[in-house]
């Protein structure tokens, strides 16, 4: 083959080429030598001398394709009932033949057509050199275009009607020719696949659109039939079956771009159009916890934009009712434990249900959280919410030495689970106050199971609420280890004195930061330290003043405890007592009988505290009341009980200081209210300092938003705090509007 341009007889060359392309397009056998010769002929025509013949070749090829497709169209029409089969057969043959022709015409495609082809800009803005209505196309594209114009479009109505009928028969249980249906539908895609813009437009317009309409009508009627013959449970199962079948059908016949559209149409007709029916049954299904029906309903409703909210609300209501049922009427004796375990049981039950039945959907998890938040924070009318106090007591019970038969690991597991319930509390500041008081008692009276568990719990609270929430708890915990170090230093201080100092007692001290501990520094009574303790107190004050300048020690005698040996009985006993009880008992060192007046003089306690202390000793029968009167008065006298006995050689005399009294609970709640007022005032000042000017409602919303992590403030409390800050001249009402506040710099 010569590459040099030469004179070519077009008619002679075209006749040879025509014979070959007829064979190619009908998939007849063509010898390799013939193929190569025709390839050379096309090259020769494109580079012919004196004038290239590429344009004429293109025109003649186009005429051939038009005639060939018209001929095939006529034969398809003659096939009557076999239109789909014949169309499919000719399409399979023609589309492959067109691919081979495109290869044969490769030189024409690359050297003539591409160089003269209109660009996107030419098509958009116009170009004078080429007929805009008949743009040049590569031969493969031209063949497909001829098929679309001369075969598909004239047969469109017949083809679509037959395709829809065949697919309807498939839905009815018949078994149509899958290969033919898929092939015909795919031809609508294939004829425009060469287009860069909207290659599926033709397929969507002539087939997809009418198919979706027909699908909607079919499933509208199908849903109506199913509703008449089924209850809700059966209806949902049948609908899911229909959807699954339709999905398989889509994959058998349609282009992938249609899958979701078809399923969406089915869902609209069988689910969205009957939401009222499904929602009406939702209540009973959830209340009876029919897991299979819940799973089916979830799958159906999830696919519809307005489907799930009703189901979510129904589950939230159900969890709320279950939670209230589980946490009401709990026995007073073990209420904290029962309350927490009941909430955890409900939480665990519904977490499992949501994960296994509802696919772990976060919308339902949020509903669970909302429901349990309302359960945990539930309060009877005109009463306070008990949850913060109950949860603090639950922790207290777990962290005390008295926690029955539990290892540290078991306590750790329970405290980890407890955080689940804790996160639902609105009034976390109330919990913090109660927890701090109970922690103080555990630490001061040595009641903690272990300091590691105490630290672990504080860290869990820190993770849940942040550093600020636990800062005081951390300081309380730290004070205990600092105090242990101070005791060692104090003992070394005593040993290193120039003169030998004998304190006469074993002495241990806790130095606590006043700002961190929830302890009152104003004692309930005056008190004179017993002589036996004076030296220890004086030496520690000396030691402390030498080591720390500018710090003031305040002795909290009402919290101190000690051990007293009872040497006057046949059996050696050790009593663990408060300092007040110790002061009364030590008075009997000098005399077996002591009057009330003498005790008052030696201890300097007021009447109420002294009487309470004496009664605690009378209750355990360590001393006797020598008066015939039952009540203690100024004339009473007391004597040691020389016949005292106890099952234990070491025993503890409990006092009201170690028990939670109603007054103490009330004080805790009052302290919470005061703290809230200060917190809100600080929040208002922070916000106004940043914003300078703010309207009333906007300020209220920002304060609520900032406070929500600790508690839910009432609007009335916020308003009172605003008024207080106006009085204190931190903020002022704007002169322009009474509904606006300005920050006072």
Curated annotation (Swiss-Prot):
It is found in: Nucleus. The gene is CUL2. This is Cullin-2. It comes from the Eukaryota. InterPro entries: Cullin, Cullin_CS, Cullin_homology, Cullin_homology_sf, Cullin_N, Cullin_neddylation_domain, Cullin_repeat-like_dom_sf, WH-like_DNA-bd_sf. Component of multiple Cul2-RING (CRL2) E3 ubiquitin-protein ligase complexes consisting of CUL2, Elongin BC (ELOB and ELOC), RBX1 and a variable substrate-specific adapter; this complex is also known as ECS (Elongin BC-CUL2/5-SOCS-box protein) complex and may consist of CUL2 or CUL5. Component of a ECS(VHL) or CBC(VHL) complex containing CUL2, RBX1, ELOB, ELOC and VHL. Component of the ECS(MED8) complex with the probable substrate recognition component MED8. Neddylated; which enhances the ubiquitination activity of ECS (Elongin BC-CUL2/5-SOCS-box protein) E3 ubiquitin-protein ligase complexes. Neddylation leads to structural rearrangment in the complex that allows interaction between the E2 ubiquitin-conjugating enzyme and the acceptor ubiquitin. CBC(VHL) complex formation seems to promote neddylation. Deneddylated via its interaction with the COP9 signalosome (CSN) complex. One of its GO terms (molecular function) is ubiquitin ligase complex scaffold activity. One of its GO terms (biological process) is intrinsic apoptotic signaling pathway. Belongs to the cullin family. Gene3D superfamilies: Cullin Repeats, Cullin, Chain C, Domain 2, Winged helix-like DNA-binding domain superfamily/Winged helix DNA-binding domain. Residues 675-735 form the Cullin neddylation domain. Pathway: Protein modification; protein ubiquitination. The modification Phosphothreonine is found at residue 661. Changing residue 660 to K: Activates UBE2R2-mediated ubiquitin chain extension in the absence of neddylation. The Cullin neddylation domain restrains the RING domain of RBX1 in the E3 ubiquitin-protein ligase complex; this restraint is removed upon neddylation of the cullin. Coiled coil: none annotated. The keyword Nucleus applies. Changing residue 621 to R: No effect on conjugation with NEDD8. The modification N6-acetyllysine is found at residue 393. It comes from Homo sapiens.
